[in-house]
Amino acid sequence: MRTQSLKPYNANYHSLITRDAQERVDAPTDSGLISELVYSENQPAVAQLLLPLLQQLGKQSRWLLWLTPQQKLSRLWLQQSGLPMSKVVQARQINPLSTVDAMEKALLTGNYSVVLGWLPELSENDRIRLRMAAKLGNAYGFVMRPLNETKLDQGQCATLKIHSSLYH
């Protein structure tokens, strides 16, 4: 497993997002995908759902990138999960607001079969940017977002979370 820090990525996104971009990104394709997963600490099922896909993607020649601003991946969990340690890259200590930019840049490179990013709520523009980047880079992107427990108290339906045992 490799760990690295990323500096904020700034670019002109107007070249990626045009008036027709929404149609192109939302059209069914066989290359690239962005999915948002809202998860709860009390329900570790998302890890079990994602693990087979991550194991399959680990068989590709490309890297698996984890953009985790606050957390450090557990080496023990990676070993026990069957993910290829030599293909896992973790970028930490990223400003959470810069993580969207880092995720977009990583998806665009085509060097990663999957990019998992722990991100705040996305704007529609951010979603479009990430979908386009995933499509162009032929990669999977998983936007991981912790469940806001106060919203749960206000009647929002319970959703799944990746359990914190994945981290030190």
From Swiss-Prot:
Residues 161-168 are annotated as: Lon protease binding. Is rapidly cleaved and degraded by the Lon protease once DNA damage is repaired. Coiled coil: none annotated. Keywords: Cell cycle, Cell division, DNA damage, Septation, SOS response. Induction: By DNA damage, as part of the SOS response. GO terms for biological process: division septum assembly; DNA repair; negative regulation of cell division; SOS response. The record marks 168 as: Essential for degradation by Lon protease. SUPFAM superfamilies: P-loop containing nucleoside triphosphate hydrolases. Disulfide bonds: none annotated. Residues 106-112 are annotated as: FtsZ binding. It holds the Pfam family SulA. Belongs to the SulA family. Component of the SOS system and an inhibitor of cell division. Accumulation of SulA causes rapid cessation of cell division and the appearance of long, non-septate filaments. In the presence of GTP, binds a polymerization-competent form of FtsZ in a 1:1 ratio, thus inhibiting FtsZ polymerization and therefore preventing it from participating in the assembly of the Z ring. This mechanism prevents the premature segregation of damaged DNA to daughter cells during cell division. This is Cell division inhibitor SulA. It comes from Yersinia enterocolitica serotype O:8 / biotype 1B (strain NCTC 13174 / 8081). The gene is sulA.
